[in-house]
Design a protein with these regions (language model features):
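Exposed, flexible binding/inhibitory loops of compact, secreted disulfide-stabilized domains
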Residues: 2, 13-15, 28-145
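Bacterial N-terminal signal peptides
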Residues: 17-27
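Composition-driven detection of intrinsically disordered, low-complexity segments
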Residues: 10-11, 18
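N-terminal Lys/Arg-rich, disordered targeting/topogenic segments
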Residues: 1-9
Length: 145
């Protein structure tokens, strides 16, 4: 004969498993949709600046922060400098690309990406990759992606 307690316990286990699977798949697939919280109003023209083109005060701020990843902005003489640093890397030859710099209704959106060396480096040199872009001064908060 069947043991009723054992059978009902087994049914509860099956229901819990099915409920867990349904909830897990719901959370998993809901994370796949991309929601654009910052719809583009217009692109912003910019110039990547290096070395002496970067204001001295901003260069000092970068040196102070370069060990760790950082994001900052700096305005000077009607121009806005936006900086994204990736912190200390254990090899040289990293590159950074600007995917987008645009204006949304309430924000400036700055999207960059760090690319590692194409081949494994034998150099022991460390690097501190960062990128500085210069654009017109716009009085809006910056969202870094």
């Amino acid at each position: 004969m069947f043991n009723r307690k054992k059978t009902s316990f087994h049914r509860i286990q099956v229901y819990i498993f099915l409920l867990s699977a349904a909830l897990s798949s719901t959370f998993l697939f809901s994370g796949c949709s991309k929601q654009d919280d910052y719809p583009k109003t217009r692109d912003i023209d910019y110039t990547v600046v290096t070395g002496s083109e970067i204001p001295q005060e901003l260069r000092k701020m970068i040196r102070e922060r370069k060990e760790n990843a950082f994001e900052l902005s700096f305005s000077c003489e009607g121009e806005l400098y936006i900086v994204k640093g990736y912190g200390k890397q254990l090899s040289p030859d990293f590159s950074i690309t600007v995917n987008e710099l645009y204006l949304s209704d309430n924000y400036i959106v700055f999207d960059t990406e760090l690319y590692g060396p194409k081949q494994k480096s034998t150099s022991k040199a460390k690097s501190y990759p960062y990128i500085v872009v210069k654009t017109e001064y716009i009085n809006k908060s910056i969202v870094f992606k």
